[in-house]
Amino acid sequence: MTKGLYIESYGCQMNVYDSLMVEDILRPLGFAAVQRPEDADIIMVNTCHVREKAAEKLYSALGRMRMLRKEGALIVVAGCVAQAEGEAVFERAPFVDVVVGPQSIHTLPELIMKATRDAKQMNVEFPAISKFDVISTDLLVSRGVSAFVSVQEGCDKFCTFCVVPYTRGPEYSRSVEDVLAEVRKLADGGTKEVVLLGQNVNAYHGTYKGNEWDLGRLIRKVAEVEGIERIRYTTSHPRDMHSSLYDAHKHEPKLLPCVHLPVQSGSDSVLRKMNRKHSVQEYMDIIDTLKEARSDIALSSDFIVGFPGETEEDFEATMDLVRHVGFATSYSFKYSPRPGTPGAEYTNQVPEEEKSSRLHRLQHLLLTQQRLFTKSMIGKTVSVLVCGTEGSRSCSNEVFGKSEHMQPVYISVDGDPAGYRNKIFSVKVLEEGARSSLKGIICTDTISLPPPHSM
């Protein structure tokens, strides 16, 4: 008899990937995903510790799950808040049955079996054996048109605002062989696009036949897998950009022209306090090199405003950087102290009112740039991977896809929309849609691969 598994996942793409991995490893035990917590025999909350009040959001979610769960169902807390809180989860929510950190999710089958015997279980260790060494690609099922593939985890940078090194552990890279095995399995299931994931994905240093490979070299190898037509990677750190990756952007047509490269601040003074280990000029040099490698590249970034000690001059330096680069899209947040990080101990905290004011000004500028980038696509022909009709509007003759710059594209089509799914088309952009999306029509009946570019 099939048992229900309900997972509520918060935060980054890595958590989404981990949640899918949990589905894979529990499937042999008879579990299958369900859409409602009240139908589940296991309810799992996969948490993120990066954003503000992460722990409070967890306990609020747990309160809901407690009310909804059926008799005998287990509640599991996973992810980075589980790693950070540990035993405190049981103290604040004694109805929780299992607490497991992100690097120990491969132990869930054992933890669950023990928990069914009325004994609470916890594993928040950083085990010597990686979860990737335990979880076989044979367990993978089809992930759809686009799929995440984790290639690197953890962080050794220790930015003073960030909890990731403490919750995800040190940097670890999967072997090239393991990555390729997963990509091939996904391609066999119909996946056309893979997104290579890592906390610092461009710090990748996996081995292949005894030799260490970097991310640029891995990308070229992934591009050789039959059926894979698009490759992306996220998230990068400026310190780990290297010539091999630039070359991949210049010469590998399957690597999409989009890079997410967080800078956090445009002030050298703030960057030093953040322990970012790069300067504004070094970041700008990276941007220039990326644009030289691929002239149509779309750039995105992360920004934190109101970091302790940030002055108005520091903030204006961030605004100047944004104006100079011209981002296609970006994410911006007010600084909030994270317990256990050096930034939380700094005394010169910026008043909340000032943080809010700066965030509003920055987001207005970033949104203006995003709109300009969207409008610049009108009249152009873009390569679109059709995902299906799930994201489309109510029109029966419309499909939804993503451009090579990851913009949502709605396409008017003839015939059955289902026949367009999981294929790449050249699309003429006719107009801007809602929320920075595009609308267009297929300009050729020929299904095309992402076109090679020339410099």
Swiss-Prot record:
Subcellular location: Cytoplasm
Catalytic activity: N(6)-dimethylallyladenosine(37) in tRNA + (sulfur carrier)-SH + AH2 + 2 S-adenosyl-L-methionine = 2-methylsulfanyl-N(6)-dimethylallyladenosine(37) in tRNA + (sulfur carrier)-H + 5'-deoxyadenosine + L-methionine + A + S-adenosyl-L-homocysteine + 2 H(+)
Entry's family note: Belongs to the methylthiotransferase family. MiaB subfamily.
Record-annotated Radical SAM core domain positions: 141-375
Record EC number: 2.8.4.3
Residue ranges of every copy of the MTTase N-terminal domain listed in the record: 3-117
Stated name of the protein: tRNA-2-methylthio-N(6)-dimethylallyladenosine synthase
Cited SUPFAM superfamilies: Radical SAM enzymes (SSF102114)
Binding site for [4Fe-4S] cluster 1: C12, C48, C80
Keyword annotations: 4Fe-4S, Cytoplasm, Iron, Iron-sulfur, Metal-binding, S-adenosyl-L-methionine, Transferase, tRNA processing
Gene Ontology terms, MF aspect: 4 iron, 4 sulfur cluster binding; metal ion binding; N6-isopentenyladenosine methylthiotransferase activity
